[in-house]
């Protein structure tokens, strides 16, 4: 019996609950709840409160700065993109001024050219006759030089041809006279026909000379030579 009691006591002690605060009830009053305290001393509790407060405040500050910095970066990035797009779409002020100046110059250039072209045309039209009038006088000098050259060139062979014609006519006349005296009437008729051909040839030569040198007919020297040639041919015909 004694052993049974001792074993029951030893086994019953661990089964008992440790001393501590009573569990909260649904119907517990606020006064009873507020009167209870956290376990531990008051100093350790203050340190715990400080550590928790500092960590929470640091976390909040870090998150706040991170969010604000992210927003600022995004806003800066957006503004940079907007400025770049504006710069690409719109040229700077210096280029705008240059473009405006170039456009004004291009618009003024046709007007200036048109205004300058009209006086130039009006001035060139009256100047043209003056230039022609100034250049026209040398033409008579050239014309005078050309006839003089033609006269000189044509006058040189003229005396030789006239002399040859006169010599031929005199020879023909002497031969015909001698033949006429020696031969009979038939030969005289033949000689007369030959003289007619020579006479026809001599005026033909004179006509050819006149046609070849139209300018010589105007000069006095050419007229004298032609008169002498014609006189020689007439004398030959008269002798015949």
From Swiss-Prot:
Its main location: mitochondrion. InterPro entries: MGARP, MGARP_N. Signal peptide: none annotated. GO terms for biological process: anterograde axonal transport; axon development; axonal transport of mitochondrion; cellular response to gonadotropin-releasing hormone; cellular response to hypoxia; cellular response to steroid hormone stimulus; cerebral cortex development; negative regulation of dendrite development. Residues 73-87 have a biased composition (Basic and acidic residues). It comes from the Eukaryota. The chain crosses the membrane at residues 46-64. Residues 65-240 are mitochondrial intermembrane. GO terms for cellular component: axon cytoplasm; mitochondrial inner membrane; mitochondrial outer membrane; mitochondrion. Residues 72-240 are annotated as: Disordered. Residues 1-45 are cytoplasmic. It is found in: Mitochondrion; Mitochondrion outer membrane; Mitochondrion inner membrane. Keywords: Membrane, Mitochondrion, Mitochondrion inner membrane, Mitochondrion outer membrane, Transmembrane, Transmembrane helix. It is a single-pass type IV membrane protein. PANTHER family: PROTEIN MGARP. Plays a role in the trafficking of mitochondria along microtubules. Regulates the kinesin-mediated axonal transport of mitochondria to nerve terminals along microtubules during hypoxia. Participates in the translocation of TRAK2/GRIF1 from the cytoplasm to the mitochondrion. Also plays a role in steroidogenesis through maintenance of mitochondrial abundance and morphology. Plays an inhibitory role during neocortex development by regulating mitochondrial morphology, distribution and motility in neocortical neurons. Interacts with RHOT1/Miro-1, RHOT2/Miro-2, TRAK1/OIP106 and TRAK2/GRIF1. This is Protein MGARP.
């Amino acid at each position: 019996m004694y052993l049974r009691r001792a074993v029951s006591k030893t086994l019953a002690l661990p089964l008992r609950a440790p001393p501590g605060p009573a569990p909260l009830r649904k119907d517990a009053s606020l006064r009873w709840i507020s009167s209870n305290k956290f376990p531990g001393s008051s100093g350790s509790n203050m340190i715990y409160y400080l550590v928790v407060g500092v960590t929470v405040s640091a976390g909040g500050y870090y998150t706040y700065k991170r969010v604000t910095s992210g927003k600022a970066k995004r806003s800066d990035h957006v503004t940079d993109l907007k400025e770049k797009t504006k710069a690409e779409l719109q040229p700077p002020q210096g280029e705008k001024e240059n473009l405006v100046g170039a456009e004004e110059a291009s618009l003024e250039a046709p007007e200036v050219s048109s205004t300058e072209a009209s006086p130039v045309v009006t001035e060139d039209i009256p100047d043209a006759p003056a230039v022609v009038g100034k250049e026209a006088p040398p033409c008579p000098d050239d014309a005078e030089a050309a006839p003089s050259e033609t006269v000189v060139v044509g006058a040189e062979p003229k005396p030789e041809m006239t002399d040859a014609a006169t010599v031929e006519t005199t020879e023909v006349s002497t031969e015909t006279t001698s033949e006429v005296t020696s031969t009979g009437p038939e030969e005289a008729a033949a000689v007369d026909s030959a003289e007619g051909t020579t006479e026809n040839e001599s005026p033909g030569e004179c006509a050819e000379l006149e046609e070849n040198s139209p300018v010589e007919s105007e000069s006095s020297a050419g007229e004298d030579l032609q008169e002498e040639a014609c006189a020689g041919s007439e004398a030959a015909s008269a002798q015949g």
